[in-house]
Structure formats: C-alpha cells, structure tokens
C-alpha cells in the first residue's frame, strides 16, 4: 500500500491518534521484515560533521519518536540520522488533549504537546536495546515544573543518562509549549546554562573517553539582532552546532483556517520561508565556525536545497514526512547530494 493511500485513511482520524497508529504500524511492519521489501535503499552521500559521518544529509527531527520506541523502524526510511525526544528527567503527561492539529490546506501542523514523554530512564533503556547502529541524536529538555533558574540541572540529568548512547545531544531551549523555556535563549540565562552544560560535557568526555557533540535548538521567532546575539553566545561557549528552527508562534497565513488559532507551535509549509531566513542569518553570524542543521518547513527537495544554500550542512524533516511520506527523504537527500561542492 502506498503512503498516499495510507494517508487517506490516517487523515480521517484525529491527528494524535493517527500519529500513534502510524508508528505502531511501522513497528509491526519492521518486526515482520516487510519494510525492506517496500522501502528503497538509503541514498548514500556521506557528510562529515562534528566528528560524525552522516550517511546522507537528511535526518528525522525530534518530536516524532519521543521515547525512542520506534528507532529501528524509522531507520528503514532512508534517513541519514535520527533524532529522538524531547526527553525530560521525569516522566510527564504533557498538555491535555486535543493538542495536535492538522491544517491540511497549508500542509501544516499545530502542536502543544508539552514534552509528553516517559522520562529519561525509559529512553535510556530504549537506546540501549536498539538494533540501529547509525547516527542517533537525543533531544533533551526540562520538566514543566522545574523553575527556569534550575533548568540546567534537568538538562544535565538527561545528559548524564543518554551520553553513552548518543551520537550528538540537542539542548532544546526553544519549544513554545513549556512555560518560560524560550527565555533561556538569551542573556545571562543562556550563558549560565551553557557554562554548566559544557562543564558536564567535559566530565562525560573524561568519564567515557568519548566526545559527544552538543547542539542548541533555537526558535524562529527572533529578530535578526537576536539571532546574532544567540550566535555570539554559542561561539563564546564553544557549542558544537545549532539547529534552526523549532516551531513558530506566528499564525501568518493560517489564521482563517480551522484550528488556525489553536495555541501551540506551528510547523510545516507556513514555516518554510521564516526558518530558512533564520538559518541564513545564523550561518552568517556564526561565520562558518560551527555548523547549522536546518529544520522547519522542509516539504520538498527544493526546500531542502534552499536550506543548504542558506548555509545549513544538514536538514531535518517532520511535518514534510507526515504530508509527503518517506519519498521526501530520498528526494531531499538526492537533491542535496547533487549540489556542487
């Protein structure tokens, strides 16, 4: 059955139910050995970045597999890397449903999930048991009830657990669905937290004899000056990379649609242009000294190419996968692989 046929069925269901059923179907197909029969071989054009060899430049963004339950099935879809999470130290339910909405007319999604996950101990066990041996990123966050001034302790608690299993770790300070989280992107709050996180990275490196890169995921809802300010701080603290961007609070172009005014972060096609602009500004500000991974509104191969031309070294997809299916992964990887240089 083609993805487009499956989508017709899945899109008749509420968005969160569709999400959960899709992942369970993927796991069943993988366990039955069926995915290899239907999925094309992964496109290979290796990218060397942060001391890691990525088989291709297209990865899965965090948010689809929050607990690491579906890594092995997702690995069959052609991704050059997979990012799981966001995971927090303690399990939490997230916000009450309904909390996930499709805006099909604009190929968009609004979510206010609120870091629902089973906690870092569960995630660590899933990472330990996975068969997938490729590049795995782990996206870490803070619990909702942890005060912002104590956020670093939550990130460090997660890092301490997942470090042995992660290829890289993403510090998520940009979700719009955890109160006060985005304030950590600026000023003394960011500097203080990054210092503690870098100290933790050094301890983990010494303890495990293995350096795991740390990247910071930023929001799209910043002025150019704010993007440059964040970039300077990332450089000051020798962060290994950045992901641009998370979801947006803007509702430009979707206000009149059903669910268009729901609270939460907007992703998909309406985010494409803004996210690419932030990627470009961030790359300029970072002066090529640390790499940028582009995420946000990658709905086509051309979108992926535009992100790379804006300066990104890798791209991630999520909403595009929901609307286009696995074909997007190969199309985007081939398009990036075909670029000169």
UniProtKB/Swiss-Prot annotation:
Any one GO biological process: 'de novo' pyrimidine nucleobase biosynthetic process
Function, as annotated: Catalyzes the conversion of dihydroorotate to orotate with quinone as electron acceptor.
Assembly behavior: Monomer.
Broad EC category: oxidoreductase
Localization in the cell: Cell membrane
Origin species: Hahella chejuensis (strain KCTC 2396)
This protein's UniProt keywords: Cell membrane, Flavoprotein, FMN, Membrane, Oxidoreductase, Pyrimidine biosynthesis
GO terms under cellular component: cytoplasm; plasma membrane
Binding sites annotated in the UniProt record for FMN: 62-66, 86, 139, 172, 217, 245, 268, 297, 318-319
Similarity comment text for this entry: Belongs to the dihydroorotate dehydrogenase family. Type 2 subfamily.
Reaction catalysis annotation: (S)-dihydroorotate + a quinone = orotate + a quinol
Active-site residues, Swiss-Prot/TrEMBL: 175 (nucleophile)
Protein name listed in UniProt: Dihydroorotate dehydrogenase (quinone)
Pathway(s) the chain acts in: Pyrimidine metabolism; UMP biosynthesis via de novo pathway; orotate from (S)-dihydroorotate (quinone route): step 1/1
Cofactor: record remark: Binds 1 FMN per subunit.
Cofactor(s) it depends on: FMN
Ligand binding (substrate): 66, 111-115, 172, 177, 246-247
Its EC number(s): 1.3.5.2
Acyltransferase in keyword set: no
Membrane protein topology class: Peripheral membrane protein
Gene Ontology terms, MF aspect: dihydroorotate dehydrogenase (quinone) activity
Keyword presence, RNA-binding: no
PROSITE patterns with a match to the protein in the record: DHODEHASE_1 (PS00911), DHODEHASE_2 (PS00912)
């Amino acid at each position: 059955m083609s993805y487009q046929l499956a989508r017709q069925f899945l899109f008749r269901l509420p968005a969160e139910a569709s999400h959960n059923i899709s992942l369970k179907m993927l796991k069943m197909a993988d366990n039955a050995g069926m995915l290899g029969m239907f999925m094309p071989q992964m496109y290979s054009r290796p990218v060397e970045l942060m001391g890691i060899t990525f088989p291709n430049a297209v990865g899965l963004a965090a948010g689809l597999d929050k607990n690491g339950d579906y890594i092995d099935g997702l690995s069959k879809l052609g991704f050059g890397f997979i990012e799981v999470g966001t995971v927090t130290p303690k399990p939490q339910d997230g916000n009450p449903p309904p909390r996930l909405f499709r805006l099909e007319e604009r190929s968009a999604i609004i979510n206010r999930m609120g870091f629902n996950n089973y906690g870092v101990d569960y995630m660590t066990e899933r990472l330990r048991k996975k068969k997938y041996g490729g590049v795995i990123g782990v996206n870490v966050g803070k619990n909702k009830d942890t005060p912002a001034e104590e956020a670093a302790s939550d990130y460090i608690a997660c890092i301490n657990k997942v470090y042995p299993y992660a290829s890289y770790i993403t510090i998520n300070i940009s979700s719009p669905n955890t109160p006060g989280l985005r304030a950590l992107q600026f000023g003394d709050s960011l500097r203080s937290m990054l210092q503690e996180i870098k100290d933790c990275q050094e301890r983990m490196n010494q303890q495990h004899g293995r350096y795991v890169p740390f990247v910071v995921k930023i929001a799209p809802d910043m002025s150019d000056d704010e993007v440059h300010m964040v970039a300077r701080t990332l450089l000051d603290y020798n962060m290994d990379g950045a992901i641009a961007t998370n979801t947006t609070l803007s509702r430009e172009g979707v206000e009149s649609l059903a669910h268009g005014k729901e609270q939460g972060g907007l992703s998909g096609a309406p985010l494409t242009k803004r996210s690419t602009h932030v990627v470009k500004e961030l790359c300029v500000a970072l002066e090529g000294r640390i790499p940028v991974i582009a995420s946000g509104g990658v709905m086509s191969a051309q979108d992926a190419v535009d992100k790379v031309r804006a300066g990104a070294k890798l791209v991630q997809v999520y909403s595009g996968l929901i609307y286009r299916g696995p074909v997007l992964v190969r199309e985007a990887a081939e398009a990036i692989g075909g670029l000169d240089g």
